[in-house]
């Protein structure tokens, strides 16, 4: 029998009578975990005007309380003031043409319009997630951006270190060294409203796992440079599992915290926090969530410019575009990060990818 299986001259001739099967849709390969947009509380800021403004306490009344004796003349005090804070919703969009030839001539089991819409939404949400961390108008000088987490943390000024321990503990500098749990504990203790989550890059998440599972911590008093590893009691089927909490607070690994450029956007410098170009470093954030628009002191992503309640973006469609044999779609989004109290955001930056230290 011929190699074609019989009847046909060659196998290639037999294959002409068949058709390959293509599975509808697209399998995703470019995946990012834990988008901040999907973890932050979101609030619709419809009808808020040009800017959103709120007040922070600046001076208290404790020092105005005076001790007096019977018969003393009492003094009137007037010394309270506030810090006014503002934020503006910034505009982002993505738009695409959809050629009618593609839909009408190449029409198949795939819905081209639905696929384009799905990928537009993915791109918009991922861009917002990146901007929540890295957007910077204060230090980056980009007027089309709001201030993201790095910029908001840098506003605390010169960073805290063990040698500069009078600086603000909401902004800490590891000075191109391994993450010290002393720094992390100190910052968490300083966040009076508490901490909802600790956002960390995957590299630091792996270091947490290794420290508590197999490697241990570095101690200056230890002869072999490590000690106290695996301080937790675990059953056999728990060995090697990721460490998901520190001090009872979730450790959230997010792919939106990426490699960064060491020494940038520190709070002592006038530049923004830059992504990696030559000297690698990492950052983590301690965040306390809360709806600022509902007078909660936490951190919120506010959005507006949409008609429907709860709509993060507005979708515009055109059946036909001038000068094109095509229709069009656009997604619009207006948003900004709101930080109610400065005590709801902490940052540790310039961390290297090394074993954790105590």
Tell where the protein language model's regions lie, with residue ranges.
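Second-shell loop/turn segments in exported
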Residues: 103-110
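Assembly/oligomerization interface modules of large self-assembling protein complexes
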Residues: 5-6, 18-96, 117, 140-147
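Sequence/fold signature of self-assembling virion shell proteins
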Residues: 2-39, 55, 143-189, 193-197, ...
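Sec-exported extracytoplasmic/periplasmic mature domains
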Residues: 121-129, 133
